[in-house]
Amino acid sequence: MNNTLNQHYEEKVRPCIDLIDSLRSLGVEKDLALPAIAVIGDQSSGKSSVLEALSGVALPRGSGIVTRCPLELKMKRKREGEEWHGKISYQDHEEEIEDPSDVEKKIREAQDEMAGVGVGISDDLISLEIGSPDVPDLTLIDLPGIARVAVKGQPENIGEQIKRLIRKFIMKQETINLVVVPCNVDIATTEALQMAQEVDPEGERTLGILTKPDLVDKGTEETVVDIVHNEVIHLTKGYMIVKCRGQKEIMERVSLTEATEREKAFFKEHAHLSTLYDEGHATIPKLAEKLTLELVHHIEKSLPRLEEQIEAKLSETHAELERYGTGPPEDSAERIYFLIDKVTAFTQDAINLSTGEELKSGVRLNVFSTLRQEFGKWKLHLDRSGENFNQRIEGEVSNYEKTYRGRELPGFINYKTFEVMVKDQIKQLEEPAVKKLKEISDAVRKVFLLLAQSSFTGFPNLLKSAKTKIEAIKQVNESTAESMLRTQFKMEMIVYTQDSTYSHSLSERKREEEDDRPLPTPKIRSTIFSTDNHATLQEMMLHLKSYYRISSQRLADQIPMVIRYLVLQEFASQLQREMLQTLQEKDNIEQLLKEDFDIGSKRAALQNKLKRLMKARSYLVEF
């Protein structure tokens, strides 16, 4: 195939295309989109014939779905006199092709291998490389033809499957969409062009190829000329028109070289289409030249963004790998040190968690904000309980006086009444205190479990060991704390405080009461103090409120201290002791270091991705 590119540009073309082909063969397309030309068309649009004419080899053709997998067609122009060379690769298979006539058979075998024998399709890529003096420097991706109706043996939704596969390629901004449309159909109704317009409404990355100009109805030739002149449906990249071998010429074994000569003669001699030939819009050689120029320009334009994307992906992959860690070493001595480091880091973070210090691992966990909130709620509960107590004292004191008053003369405080009421009030606080303990114990347990999950990601046995210890320590320490709390409340049943403390509280309470109560008139004052029972009641209320204030202040501090010591501080210390004890059990080391298969394979995949991206970056730097 004669290529009209000048020598200077040819020297630039191959390296550009080779760069992208190298990146694609590295598998970089798994990580980001690469510049490409995707070929799409309705069934029987002449798509295969165009690709055959460009590549110089026969591709699978026939009725129904012929292209059943995306086919990457890498064409490399060789010097005159150099031998034809072919290679096909897919999945883990790679095979040299000695004879151009074997290409069609090899593609069919690959499609049967990947999409199953029959008429199914697959998203997996087949790569076909062709080196020849008769091909342009060009890489295309051929996609299955758009099917409207399922045929025998095909799933009912085959049309949707194909469209989904096509969209996956053509929606990428890095892809030039080559839309093949026969001249003898209404271009506006072709599904391939409609799909291209959906993803590229302005037509900035869509190039139209008209085929089968020999089948144009008489009188409609000018419409074809108008389409190619971009006057019907506008595409920024415009249109080309080609005439490939028809079925009759294939049956007559007309060679591709002869078909190119016939195509040239057809356009030059055509009454209406010759103008398109003169303008450089017609024939396969002109199409090859345009596609090569378009691809190279597209690659050059995409390179800066590609470099940015690779850098971003490298950074992202490094960060992900850090989360998965390095994995256990192979050497047995190093494995022990690896386990020691892992367990020590976890236990140190557990201690830091219990003291409110920053975690070495960098994990964002904080148990103290929860404790502060919960202890604040406990203090609020005590205050509200005191307010309720104050409100009901008057009625209850009167009832208790009737029940417990003995031989005392009027005006004397009944200590028994005072004691019973205080004990009853404090007793009501016991269960809320135990409930608060359990809530905080659960919250602390959850935080330690989160720390274990973060510290032992990918090591299920080590994580299980830590979780088992956390659950056991939680049960024991919670039980001990509950016992201590209940003992505290038993001690609170002894009505006691230092005389000076009580006197101070009583004086404070009297002062508050006097400040809150308006000064009574002499008449009212004499009435109040002449009523012995009322005087007793007023004084009793002062004593009750004063003592409750002392007791509640004790409980406001003591309950949180018990909880914090046993449920957090002692919990962390015990967890540290037991986890470090695990390191003494030499027989369990291998079991503990057994890695989660998914994590191991994920790390391996990330390491491969990192190598792939670093190699890609080096290609771009060297380019």
Curated annotation (Swiss-Prot):
Intracellular or extracellular location(s) = Cytoplasm
Q: Which superkingdom heads the taxonomic lineage of this protein's source? A: Eukaryota
* Location (main, coarse): cytoplasm
Q: Which UniProt keywords apply?
A: Cytoplasm, GTP-binding, Nucleotide-binding
Coiled-coil intervals: none
Q: Where is this region: G2 motif?
A: 66-68
Name a GO molecular-function annotation: GTPase activity
- Chain ranges passing through the membrane: none
Residues the record lists as binding GTP:
41-48, 142-146, 211-214
User: Is this entry keyworded ATP-binding?
Assistant: no
Matching PROSITE patterns, A to Z?
Answer: G_DYNAMIN_1 (PS00410), G_DYNAMIN_2 (PS51718), GED (PS51388)
Region G5 motif, as annotated, extends over: 243-246
Q: Which CDD domains match?
A: DLP_1
InterPro entries on file: Dynamin, Dynamin_GTPase, Dynamin_GTPase_CS, Dynamin_N, Dynamin_stalk, G_DYNAMIN_dom, GED, GED_dom
Identify the residues that the record assigns to the GED domain, covering every copy: 537-623
Induction: what does the entry report? Answer: By polyinosinic-polycytidylic acid (poly I:C) and viral haemorrhagic septicaemia virus (VHSV) strain 07.71 in muscle, head kidney, spleen and liver.
Question: One cellular component GO annotation, for this chain's record?
Answer: plasma membrane
Checking Gene3D superfamilies in the record gives: Dynamin, middle domain, P-loop containing nucleotide triphosphate hydrolases
**Record carries keyword GTP-binding:** yes
- Which Gene Ontology BP annotations are present? defense response to virus; receptor internalization; response to type I interferon; synaptic vesicle budding from presynaptic endocytic zone membrane
| Ranges of residues in domain Dynamin-type G | 31-304
Q: Which family does it belong to?
A: Belongs to the TRAFAC class dynamin-like GTPase superfamily. Dynamin/Fzo/YdjA family.
Know the name of this protein?
Interferon-induced GTP-binding protein Mx3
Question: What organism does the record attribute this protein to?
Answer: Oncorhynchus mykiss
Gene coding for it: mx3
